[in-house]
A protein has these predicted regions:
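Short acidic/polar micro-motifs at solvent-exposed secondary-structure junctions
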Residues: 1-3, 7-12, 21-49, 64-75, ...
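Generic non-transmembrane alpha-helical segments
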Residues: 9-16, 172-176
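Glycine-centered tight turns that cap/initiate beta-strands
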Residues: 12-18, 91, 152
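A structural micro-motif
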Residues: 16-17, 41, 104
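A generic structural-conservation signal
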Residues: 19-20, 60
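Mid-to-C-terminal secondary-structure elements
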Residues: 49-63, 74-176
């Protein structure tokens, strides 16, 4: 399990620009809006640095506030694909989705930043950056246990300061 100290130590590496910890569940059959079920979606439990580290920007509504990570606020950000598929042309902001029987209020819509071009050098990198689901839902990582009733392993993404630093950033982070 990653701790705040782990993240601090990773971010202090000279090769690292930022890092994020997250959990993920692919194809949950527990995501609804009204009577519409979303098949083949992916749910992410993210920390406050996820969007910046991975290259997302909020295009509608707002992103997570600090309190969303500490107060167990049941809020969600969805990607544009899910917004279009599940809400059928309506704005999702302010709507309530059901994840595993728990109501989450959608506060924003995210898209990949067009300036963000990851370097993909492994199969894991490909799956991290190339999403083929019918949509993504992001919830604060502290809400993961509310939705799935148990902890799952966290993943870590490290954003290097430049391409020359990628190998060392990854190796040094893995050693921590």
């Amino acid at each position: 399990m990653f701790t705040p100290d782990t993240k601090k130590r990773i971010n202090e590496l000279k090769e690292v620009e930022s890092s994020t910890f997250y959990r993920t569940r692919n194809n949950p059959d527990n995501l609804f809006y009204l009577n519409n079920k979303m098949d083949s979606s992916t749910i992410y439990g993210v920390d406050k640095d996820y969007f910046d580290t991975v290259g997302y920007e909020i295009v509608e509504g707002k992103g997570f506030a600090e309190r969303n990570f500490t107060k167990f606020d049941k809020v969600a950000v969805v990607d544009k694909t899910l917004a279009e598929g599940l809400f059928q042309g309506e704005s999702p902001v302010g709507k309530v989705i059901d994840i595993s029987g728990e109501p989450f209020t959608v506060i924003g819509v995210a898209v990949k930043n067009s300036n963000f071009e990851p370097v993909i050098s492994s199969v894991e990198d490909y799956y991290t950056y190339n999403q083929t689901s019918s949509g993504l839902v992001f919830i604060p990582t502290n809400d993961w246990g509310i939705v799935f009733r148990y902890d799952e392993p966290e993943n870590c993404i490290v954003k290097a300061v430049d391409t020359d630093s990628m190998t060392n950033a990854g190796k040094k982070s893995a050693d921590i």
